[in-house]
């Protein structure tokens, strides 16, 4: 079975997201934990969560993926911004325990001319202060495209962050196809080679989710602009190879393409028809 979903609005709660996922043929979804700008999160509606968990069990949902606000920067030069990122992420993880055994994804951040080494140290330090031994949520570092001073632009930087985290069992990676294509990893022509490199540097056992996006920009452009599946520089053939690859096909795939629900439904149908497992 292809485990696939897309980014959904959380404005009407978890049950609503689950129902919308089913309407478009998905068995998972991604959502923002709060406003993308990081404002106060809505109170947890325990009845809504209960109804969603029942729906998810009845329909064989795989793990869902919570996404931290884009504006968080755990390696900012401003100490207040770093503290804010830690505060929000810690609160998000506390709330995620209402939906146990799922995934939480965040962008590592930008070091803003402090240097990559400083950025890596701040990010790993933030994770060490946030992660708890008894948590059930796995925190995923997202692979980035390398625009500006982003940390996580290559596998080595992600690996170094993980190396410095104490509770490594609670940390994994979300691989974004648009991001790594734009960062200079040739998933179109050399997917096996890219995965071998990932495995040797980070370890495929640390790969827990994939953001499945085409790219509006050419290879190694360091731009990060998502395109609908098959209409960008990655293309449908390469995406088909990704979802069918024996080292990837078991993972949950999350579409973040520029679409409304109907567009996501069409993409999911297309990808299911291309899935050969």
From Swiss-Prot:
Q: Which UniProt keywords apply?
A: DNA damage, DNA repair, Endonuclease, Hydrolase, Metal-binding, Nuclease, Zinc
Query: Record-annotated residues binding Zn(2+) 2?
Result: 142, 176, 211, 256
Protein residues bound to Zn(2+) 1: 67, 107, 142
What name does the UniProt record give this protein? Answer: Probable endonuclease 4
What role does this protein play? Endonuclease IV plays a role in DNA repair. It cleaves phosphodiester bonds at apurinic or apyrimidinic (AP) sites, generating a 3'-hydroxyl group and a 5'-terminal sugar phosphate.
- Name the top EC class: hydrolase
According to its UniProt record, the EC number is 3.1.21.2
GO biological process entries: base-excision repair
Question: Which Gene3D superfamilies does this entry report, sorted A to Z?
Answer: Divalent-metal-dependent TIM barrel enzymes
Query: Which reaction does this chain catalyze?
Result: Endonucleolytic cleavage to 5'-phosphooligonucleotide end-products
> A single GO molecular function, which one?
DNA binding
Tell me its family. Belongs to the AP endonuclease 2 family.
What InterPro entries would the database entry show? AP_endonuc_2, AP_endonuc_F2_Zn_BS, Xyl_isomerase-like_sf, Xyl_isomerase-like_TIM-brl
For this chain's record, the cofactor binding note is: Binds 3 Zn(2+) ions.
Q: What cofactors does the UniProt entry give for this protein?
A: Zn(2+)
- Binding-site residues, Zn(2+) 3: 179, 224, 226
Q: Which PROSITE patterns does its entry note?
A: AP_NUCLEASE_F2_2, AP_NUCLEASE_F2_4
């Amino acid at each position: 079975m292809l485990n696939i979903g897309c980014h959904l609005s959380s404005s009407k709660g978890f049950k609503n997201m689950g129902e919308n996922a089913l309407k478009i043929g998905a068995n998972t979804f991604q959502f923002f934990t709060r406003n993308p700008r990081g404002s106060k999160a809505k109170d947890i509606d325990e009845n809504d969560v209960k109804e969603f968990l029942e729906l998810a069990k009845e329909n064989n949902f795989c793990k869902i993926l919570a996404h931290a606000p884009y504006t968080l920067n755990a390696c900012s030069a401003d100490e207040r911004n770093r503290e804010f990122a830690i505060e929000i992420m810690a609160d998000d993880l506390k709330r995620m325990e209402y939906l146990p055994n799922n995934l939480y994804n965040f962008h590592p951040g930008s070091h803003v001319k402090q240097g990559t080494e400083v950025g890596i140290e701040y990010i790993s330090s933030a994770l060490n202060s946030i992660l708890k031994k008894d948590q059930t949520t796995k925190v995923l570092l997202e692979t980035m495209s390398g625009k500006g001073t982003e940390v996580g632009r290559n596998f080595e930087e992600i690996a170094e962050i993980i190396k410095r985290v104490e509770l490594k069992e609670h940390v994994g990676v979300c691989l974004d196809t648009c991001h790594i294509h734009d960062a200079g990893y040739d998933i179109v022509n050399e997917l096996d080679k890219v995965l071998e490199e990932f495995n040797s540097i980070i370890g495929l056992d640390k790969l827990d989710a994939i953001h499945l996006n085409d790219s509006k920009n050419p290879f190694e452009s360091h731009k990060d602009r998502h395109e609908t599946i098959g209409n960008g520089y990655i293309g449908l053939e390469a995406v088909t190879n990704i979802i069918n690859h024996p080292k990837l096909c078991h993972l949950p795939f999350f579409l973040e393409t520029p679409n409304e629900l109907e567009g996501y439904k069409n993409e999911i149908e297309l990808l299911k028809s291309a899935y050969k497992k």
